[in-house]
C-alpha cells in the first residue's frame, strides 16, 4: 500500500477546517498517491496522470461509483427514499424530456422576473436555487407543483431534504444521524403529501401525458392506493434531489463570474451563446469541489504509473477535482472561458492527461445532464442579464464552504447584489 497520510481525516469523521486543503496538504507531503484512514474507512487517493486514467477506467462491478454515491447520500437522506424506486434519476435526460424541461425553464424565468419586480436586492444563490426548484418541480412533480403556496411548501421541504448537505456540510452529518434524520423524514412526508395531491388531480383529469411525471405514475399503476401514492412521491423526491442542486449552484457561479468580468458579460447580453456556454463550462470547472470516488467491491488493481496497487474490498479509491482542475497546467487557477472550444479544452495536449481537467466528469463519472445544463445556464444568464442591470455587493470573490468535499461549490456566506430593470 502507498504511504498513509497520518493525521488526515475527512470532514464527516473529524473536524476539518478546509477539506480540500487537508487533502492538498497530504498530497504535498506524500506525493500523488497516498492512503487515508478516516473513521472506520480506508481511502486510496490518486492524482498522477496514469492513476487518474486508471481510476476512471475501473470496472463498475469491481469498484462502484453507484455504491459510493449511495453511501455518501445516505448520510443525509432517509433510507426509505432509496428503497424500491422504479423511475431513477438516470432516466431524466431523454431528448423529448429535455425539450420540455427547457420550456419549463422559460416559464420559470418569467415567473422569477415577475417575483423580482423592477428593482431590489437578492442573494445570487438563493435566486438560482429557487429557479432550479421551480423548473424541476414543473417538469416532474405533477400539476400545480410549481406555483403558489404549493411551490413554496415544496421548495422549503426540498431545502431541508437536500442530499448535497452530505458533502456540502459533512461536518453536520453527525447531528443528522443523532436525530435519526427527524427533520429530513418530516420534509419527505411533506413532499409525499403534496405530490399525492398532484396525483389525485392527475387522476381526476384523466391525463395521459407521457412526460416524466406520467411515466412515474404509470410505473406505480398496479399498486394499492397508499403504496402507489407514496411510491410516486418518493420517485419524484429522489429525482429532484439528484438533479437540481448542483445545477443551481453552477448557475450561481457563472452569474458571479460574469458580474466580475463585464466585457464578457456584455457579449453574453448581446447574444453570444457560444461564449455563454464556454463561461458556464469555465465557472463550473473552477467551482468543482467534487470527490470522485469508487467503493471497492472485489479486489482491483490501480495503476498509478510507478506502481500498481492491489486494493481490497471495502476500501474507497478517490481523486479530488478541485486539486486537479487548478494544478494540472499553468494558469488553470484563473477564469478564462477562451480555454474551451465548444465542450472541450482547446489545448488538451498541454495536459499530462486530458483526464486531469473537467467541468462535468469523465467516463462513468460524466454528468449525463451536461448538454441540458449548458443550455439551461445559457438561457438563464441571457434572460436575467438581459432584463436587469446587476451590481454586486461583494468586494472579493466569494469563497466556497470550507468543509465541502463534493459537488459544485456552495458559497460560504451571502452573495448579495442590487438589481434594476435595464
Predicted regions and their residues:
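Central I-helix of cytochrome P450 enzymes
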Residues: 191, 219-270, 377
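Conserved cytochrome P450 K-helix E-x-x-R motif and the immediately C-terminal K′/meander segment
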Residues: 12-25, 271-309
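Cytochrome P450 catalytic core segment centered on helix I
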Residues: 156-225
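N-terminal membrane-proximal hinge/A-helix region immediately C-terminal to the signal-anchor transmembrane segment
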Residues: 1-72, 356
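Conserved cytochrome P450 K-helix/beta-meander segment immediately N-terminal to the heme-binding cysteine loop
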Residues: 319-348
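Cytochrome P450
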Residues: 38-41, 45-49, 67-109, 116-134, 146-152, ...
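Cytochrome P450 heme-binding "Cys pocket" and the immediately downstream C-terminal segment
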Residues: 372-406
